[in-house]
Amino acid sequence: MVRNTAGEVLFIFRNGKWDLPKGKTEKGENIEQTAVREVEEETGVTGLEITEFLLHTYHVFKRNGEYRLKLTHWYAMETEYNGVFAPQEDEGIMEVAWKDETATKEALLNSYENIKLLF
């Protein structure tokens, strides 16, 4: 979960829902490196600093007819970035936005249950 200097949270809009940037670890990466890389790739936001580990979440999804359990490691990050966003459209990301407390509450009404656990 990324916050800027104003305390706003970085959200992505993908598959008709507000979500937080995340992704899979690549060969040779540790989990913290993955977290930073995925935010940069999915949003264009740079200058990220991990401040703390938050929690793990789990969710079940179906791939090729089989159910799978996905573990996500969540970190708190901060940035002073105030540049232009670069949504990773080939990953289905249609919008990137900073959201204040009121807008975050609204976004969470159209989000995933595991994302709501972070707030």
Protein language model regions, located:
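A short, polar/proline- and glycine-enriched secondary-structure boundary/capping micro-motif
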Residues: 19-24, 97-98, 118
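N-terminal strand-loop-strand
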Residues: 1-21
